[in-house]
Amino acid sequence: MQLMDLKKQGIDIQENIPLSRFTFTKTGGPAQYLAFPKNLNELELLVDTVKENNIPLTVIGNASNLIIRDGGISGLVLILTKMDTIVANKDEATVTADAGARIIDTSEAACEAGLSGLEFAAGIPGSVGGAVFMNAGAYGGETEFVIKSVRVLTRTGEFKTYTHDEMEFGYRHSLVQETGDIVVSATFGLEPGDKWAIKAKMEYFNGLRRAKQPLEYPSCGSVFKRPAGHFVGPMIIKAGLQGKRIGGAEDSMKHAGFIVNVGGATATDYLDLIHLIQKTIKKDFGVDLQTEVRTIGKEKD
């Protein structure tokens, strides 16, 4: 079966679609094929078909901490945002969410059920799958602290469940970055708490985010990992790079280390500015800045 034949089976699959429509930076080239599976059956069929036809497969979440190069992505790109069911179980103190569900919505579902532990995620714009993949965190919380289990679809087409310990979480790292497994759902193990206290904590974190982050512009969030013994923002400021602009990409005047699209930016603008910051920080401070943001895709011809 050919990939586009799946359209006849009701699967939402398209050709040559600009990925800038979906990324938080509003940059990125086209996907050769782009599909939005609605359920596990469609996802499994898509994975089987690309395997059968030797087509490259890329999965992206909410594209909030992602740069896609201007040449786009060959093969099939999967966006799982239509797989977004969230189920809270107050008796077991768990929340299970599909990979395409927003982690913000998952945090809110936990709050409504009076379950504490996901408050840190109240302002994280990514998907559950992306949060697991990157071990997303904020305000002292990390995805790994609350993960109970993760269900995946392997690239060989088998469903598998990993325990917390099997996920090999690290700073902005998880096992699935190595295996290429597709996260399909995650179960969070939480603690009973007071709904209003949980809500107040979430609102506090959201207030901090609004005050400190440049939410008025498209961006990919925090670009760099925090190096041991250093803070990225102050180094960028001391190096004179806050406000530095290449094309339409600017290191934010509101929060150094966030690169925003102030108008017409390309992925190349973003990457050139990232490389300039890395080179300058290395020269001035002897520190190698590693990116937290994930970069995928090919250069434009």
Predicted regions and their residues:
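Anion-binding (especially nucleotide phosphate/pyrophosphate-binding) glycine-rich loop
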Residues: 1-128
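Structural signature of FAD isoalloxazine-binding scaffolds in flavoprotein oxidoreductases
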Residues: 28-29, 35-40, 67-85, 133-164, ...
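A generic local secondary-structure boundary/capping motif
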Residues: 66, 107-110, 118-122, 135-142, ...
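An N-terminal domain-start capping segment
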Residues: 129-139, 201-205
